[in-house]
Amino acid sequence: MSERKLFTSESVSEGHPDKIADQISDAILDAILAEDPEAHVAAETVVYTGSVHVFGEISTSAYVDINRVVRDTIAEIGYTNAEYGFSANSVGVHPSLVEQSTDIAQGVNEALEAREGQKDDLNLIGAGDQGLMFGFAIDETPELMPLPISLSHKLVKKLADLRKSGDITYLRPDAKSQVTVEYDDNDQPVRVDTVVISTQHDPEVSQETIRHDVIEKVIKEVIPTSFIDDNTKYFINPTGRFVIGGPQGDSGLTGRKIIVDTYGGYSRHGGGAFSGKDATKVDRSASYAARYIAKNIVAAGLAKKAEVQLAYAIGVAQPVSVRIDTFGTSTVSETDIEKAVRQLFDLRPAGIIKMLDLKRPIYKQTAAYGHMGRTDIDLPWEKLDKVEALKQLIG
């Protein structure tokens, strides 16, 4: 009898408190970059009942109306009703932003290599901090993402679409999903074992109605029928009631959903969050570059799955390490893949920014439903434009 292996990932909706915070931080980043592409931004947000606090470090020539950006973002998410305990019109907004530390700025604005006389424009920017970052890709889905996180994202995105379109009128913005996938002996996904969905709702609707609508209009519309069978388990609002939600139910903070933002736990994570950070922060830009590399490796047929680790020292342009792990699935040696990667991808912060055009205001759209594997928006790190070059270099 074959061994039954299960893997579970979760996602949360744009109305989840932590995701509200992420979206506000990235909306502020985008507003600044739209006026000043050279800005350095580290914007953190805390949300709770009736209040938003924005704090962090920013160096920019731009003027941004933080109050307006915060309120517009909250309204777009759907918190426009005072009954929710958190509303765009009535929430208190408390910004506390200061200039970036000069000690940090001197290493970011002029990398160690430039200070030592290595005259190259791409040596001008040093990494904004030390750290390690991971990127991952796997051939389980067309977007080369693990199936559990892919389905989890699509479920909460479908809930939001139905709420915003008015197709399900009783839904409120906060929601969570969790999908457990069963794998066979060859590590191929064969079925969905369990689906958990908790969705905020108006007080008068019955749980029977919610269960019916979520199964019929969300789950069955998102998960392919080939993965569903009579033994698939559904837990819909298993507490029995979810009226109080969003920041009224729980406080939210930027950077607390880093596993949701990436691969749902299927790959390793370096620990750094993304939202509110400009591209000189390698927590963000190098994670995108690592995904870009991993996705092109898998798309080129060099491996069935690939994990890329990058690591940096603060104020230094060149990464201190590059590691490729294909978990025994590669068709060529990992050493050859790593050599090709080093030759093809400039992994200095300025090189990544140039390669992926990261000075643009493109970040708010990534702050809910995942930064990786998105098929609904155009993201530069999801491009497959290095596939042929990788094949040619490796032969």
UniProtKB/Swiss-Prot annotation:
Catalyzes the formation of S-adenosylmethionine (AdoMet) from methionine and ATP. The overall synthetic reaction is composed of two sequential steps, AdoMet formation and the subsequent tripolyphosphate hydrolysis which occurs prior to release of AdoMet from the enzyme. GO terms for cellular component: cytoplasm. Residues 100-110 are annotated as: Flexible loop. The gene is metK. The keyword ATP-binding applies. PROSITE patterns: ADOMET_SYNTHASE_1 (PS00376), ADOMET_SYNTHASE_2 (PS00377). Pathway: Amino-acid biosynthesis; S-adenosyl-L-methionine biosynthesis; S-adenosyl-L-methionine from L-methionine: step 1/1. L-methionine binds at residues 57, 100, 250, 281. It catalyses: L-methionine + ATP + H2O = S-adenosyl-L-methionine + phosphate + diphosphate. GO terms for molecular function: ATP binding; magnesium ion binding; methionine adenosyltransferase activity. Binds 2 divalent ions per subunit. The keyword Transferase applies. Pfam families: S-AdoMet_synt_C, S-AdoMet_synt_M, S-AdoMet_synt_N. Mg(2+) binds at residue 18. It comes from Streptococcus uberis (strain ATCC BAA-854 / 0140J). Homotetramer; dimer of dimers. Signal peptide: none annotated. The lineage of its organism: Bacteria, Bacillati, Bacillota, Bacilli, Lactobacillales. Its main location: cytoplasm. This is S-adenosylmethionine synthase.
